[in-house]
Amino acid sequence: AMSEGERTRARLTLLGFVFQFHFLLPEFSLMENVALPMRALGRLSDREILTRAEQLLAAFGLGEHRRKTPDQLSGGQRQRVAVARALANDPPVILADEPTGSLDSISTRQVFELLRDLVTVYGKTVVAVTHDVELAKQMHRRLHIVDGALEKDERMVVEA
């Protein structure tokens, strides 16, 4: 059996999390929020952590906001910071729990495109839980679960 420390290290290495509500720490800048998982894992130097945090924020169009705190951003921007934070330790799997549940339609589309890019550009596996039928229709694979039981397993047909 793994120790608590080993389980924590495995989570930090293998999984990134995006929640319905961003759970960014309000007293910290965007840079500091994105740096937190890297600091917890302890794999990179301080300079490498700050460089990676800056690169991730820039990749999501938030580079100029890096010194701001979350309350200075829109809901969609905060959720993009949450996605950047989920990628901080470059995990192979991103778990997204209702990632667009608290967003307007424009921000929902932007966050969905980010999640899609995580798969197509970054080669990540994204496991998303959503009640948004339109969002679910765009996923490569959909598992429809009702009362804890798998009701349907559908795969999107990609034409060559």
For each predicted feature, which ranges?
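A short acidic/small-residue loop/turn micro-motif
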Residues: 157-159
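ABC family nucleotide-binding domain
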Residues: 1-138, 142
